[in-house]
């Protein structure tokens, strides 16, 4: 490997005309240069021979040298570090960086920084003095800029709190900072000040800006008096008046204010800075939004500090408390001014101050009445918040769900809502009165404007209405408890629903209007006269027939929610609603690709359609048919009509290529539509209902579909879903078909589906109870074989591991349900007896899975249930030996080094183990005690005294007390304190 080889490799790697194979070889060569123990020498050679090699090659070499310098130890690699330092220092003294590209100069600065960190102070104690000497010898600003950028680079390395570092690195950085503070800090700050003064007089504001950056970056860890002194502060104040420097000066002031100090010291600092004079001059809207944002950040910093000082429990004299409050109150006008700013970046800059202030005022209001001036301030805050809550007059709503600007606005709204909520908690009467006025005046003003100019006001009024009663439930939300008069929320809702808002053409207004109707649907229990108009709105062109692609599918869901919420009142509008829904029940999903699926799939096709939202319409139809005032004949007719149409669509697809994606989509969508239609019907009771025949017929057709297309996982999933919904509707009518259904499902099942199948069978057991016992007995061998096979397979990546974990949980839960439902006897039948030992072993394996506390807990609970059912003299023959064999689980698993007894979930596991021991004792009594004393405890060398104490606790303490004892016992055992 030679220097020329490196240059050739860099050229090849960067040349767009070079083929991919050569380019990869070149990249690999550069990688080997960096990883090689001697590659740095070639890089050093290339850097030293400045004129011989191209800048791109030298950049790669500088980066490689930087990596090595960072890796090296300043003791074992001292010679190498000094060699590179000497070369870099020669480069700097020769002013070589003046005619270099900026990226080379930056790389040299970074390398110099890393050398400094390795060698300062013991092997390079004159670093700053030497560098300042070189800079002072030249009048060119480029030298000064180089020096200042090195200081900034040092600050990035040792004082950036956002960079995660090891404790060793933090300690090393602190040693460097201590050395700088002790040896060089005063000279550095003075040198930078002199540069700042000289270059500001020369109007070289670029270099002055770098000086300010250094002050801003370094002030957090240096003596504050080095910067906060009369000459320096006068200079900084003057920069606040210079357009080119005022933003940088603001940043420096902000960092000075942010410096961590004791409350009393910070208050004195803020008194010295006296920034209110500057704020008062900056109040008017400037022509520079960037400067306004910087001023807002400075106000925010001072406000946060003052609130913290005011809230600090440490004792301040009455005079200082008054001074702090005075400074804080003087900030209020500036807070409101910048909170109200037209630019969101400026407004959000004061959010932390506002948040802390409101929390402080809430605490204050809990112990005393707020003053009139503070209440006026809260009103001013609400006025500013409301201004920011509104869309700008010139702004249009972007209905693209991926719009970044819209997302940012909604995120800001969430934060503003928190401020509103806090003000409400401070003074609910003031808040309610103000918001009522704001909402009503917005609606009144909007009524005088054209639709294109009024939507922002109406949207604001509706949005505030939507969030106003969030969390309120029951009659108290709408009527005052004392005199039963309407609450403010009730008055607002009455105004909104009787206004002309519902006629507004803007899609966002239409959407919010429906959201309000759904959120406050219980309001119409008391205002039922409004329901006909609301139903008409929902089923009309502004609701479920909306032309807006974003509003329409949301309206389908909202109509479903509304109908479900007012089921009792909807009976009189069933036929008209069903008539308006008819044209929306045609399913049209075509094969489509997307970013996640370059080839069309069922999932990509569904994702890129409105089908999942359309399913709510099918459920809504079910709710309307079953809850309305239709005759049984009409109910049956509607059900037959819809189900026949969906089955017909599926059968049409079955008549051609079953593997064609469009046919799979058609069958899948038809099945899911039937399932969601069934969801709208109540669970079958004892009475006969008109729709039973329709759903029984549907179940027969679904079996035929499963028989034809059971090879497809998505179809199997749809059949499970739909069958589960139909079973809920038809009840025992479905029972004779269940064995065939389960048999077909199990024939083609894979691990992805096992969790769903277990859930499906659990649902059947819950519905059909003892009638499912024989069916479960027959299908259990196949099911267990599938489960054991899936759980024993090595996971092929993270997704497989997650699926296996989910299957473990479902499997344990399923077996526990069998026992809880009285199905435990099927585990001992002739068909299943052979699987009993593998089942027991699998549960014990899961109980010992250290690092999976949730799995352990449920597994141990299952074992406890088994012992409770089958242990003792009346239990199953031979189960006593198994019960005694559980003892190591109770004692040896918890002392595993990886079992964290301080973790909350692990303590729950210990609690389950304690419960297991109490159950074993209950079932075996003296047999268990004797086993512990004569067999187990001697085997593990338990001292006799400890064994005796343990048995006493086990025998005499109640379950709760023993759980606490056992948890402490295991913790002590692991720490060696027993």
Curated annotation (Swiss-Prot):
Mainly localized where? nucleus
Give the signal sequence positions: none
Q: Which Pfam families match?
A: Exportin-T, Xpo1
Q: Where in the cell is it found?
A: Nucleus; Cytoplasm
Gene Ontology cellular-component annotations: cytoplasm; cytosol; nuclear envelope; nuclear matrix; nuclear pore; nucleus
One GO term in the molecular function aspect is: GTP binding
Q: Which Gene3D superfamilies does this UniProt record tie to the protein? A: Leucine-rich Repeat Variant (1.25.10.10)
A GO biological process of this protein is: tRNA export from nucleus
InterPro entries xrefs: ARM-like, ARM-type_fold, Exportin-1/Importin-b-like, Exportin-T_C, XPOT
Which keywords has UniProt assigned to this entry? Cytoplasm, Nucleus, RNA-binding, Transport, tRNA processing, tRNA-binding
Its domain of life reads Eukaryota
> Which PANTHER family does this one have?
EXPORTIN-T, EXPORTIN-T/LOS1
Function in brief = tRNA nucleus export receptor which facilitates tRNA translocation across the nuclear pore complex. Involved in pre-tRNA splicing, probably by affecting the interaction of pre-tRNA with splicing endonuclease.
The family assignment reads:
Belongs to the exportin family.
Q: Please report the name of this protein according to its UniProt entry.
A: Exportin-T
Q: Which gene name does the record give?
A: los1
